[in-house]
Amino acid sequence: MGKRDNRVAYMNPIAMARSRGPIQSSGPTIQDYLNRPRPTWEEVKEQLEKKKKGSKALAEFEEKMNENWKKELEKHREKLLSGSESSSKKRQRKKKEKKKSGRYSSSSSSSSDSSSSSSDSEDEDKKQGKRRKKKKNRSHKSSESSMSETESDSKDSLKKKKKSKDGTEKEKDIKGLSKKRKMYSEDKPLSSESLSESEYIEEVRAKKKKSSEEREKATEKTKKKKKHKKHSKKKKKKAASSSPDSP
């Protein structure tokens, strides 16, 4: 059995397009655009002049609008001026009426005003005094509260420090005791186990005191020995210096 032939004939697309001939395009071509009718230079000048002049109808419409706008502005100004004049006249009338009424009631109002002003000033002084007292009391209370808070904080801090020191000392003593128990467990296992912790701590402190006293005694002995040696050396030097002078 032979293989099937799957080959396809190659067709050149350019050659196929040429064989079909020119395409019938719908619409204007590039040549139509290039060959379009164009105005002469004189016609262009006329169009530009017309644009500069503008249309007569638009100019007439603008003139009418301007006239109407001017009339409206004048009316509005007249209204404002008349309103301002009337308001100024009303104010002047009110001032005159107040002056007339003030002349008649000046004598009666002066006495009442003086009494009311004095009473108002006294009330204000009392209110200010009360406010000052309240402010002083508040400041005094706040200072006392702050002082008490600081004292309580300092006491708490001292207590905490003491507790921490006691705890550290106890821990150190317990650690030292545990080490010494391990060291001396072979020699005296029963005595260390039978005693309570407090008694054992006292014994350890007594032993520490004894060891410190023994160390002090040993240092004193060594100092005495050194002094004795220096004294003997001085005696020998004196004897050696005096021996050649004697014959």
UniProtKB/Swiss-Prot annotation:
Belongs to the FAM133 family. Residues 19-38, 70-247 are annotated as: Disordered. Residues 89-102, 128-140, 222-239 have a biased composition (Basic residues). The keyword Chloroplast does not apply. Residues 70-80, 165-176, 211-221 have a biased composition (Basic and acidic residues). Transmembrane segments: none annotated. The modification Phosphoserine is found at residues 82, 191-192, 194, 196. It comes from the Eukaryota. Residues 103-119 have a biased composition (Low complexity). This is Protein FAM133B. Keywords: Phosphoprotein. One of its GO terms (molecular function) is RNA binding. PANTHER family: PROTEIN FAM133, PROTEIN FAM133B.
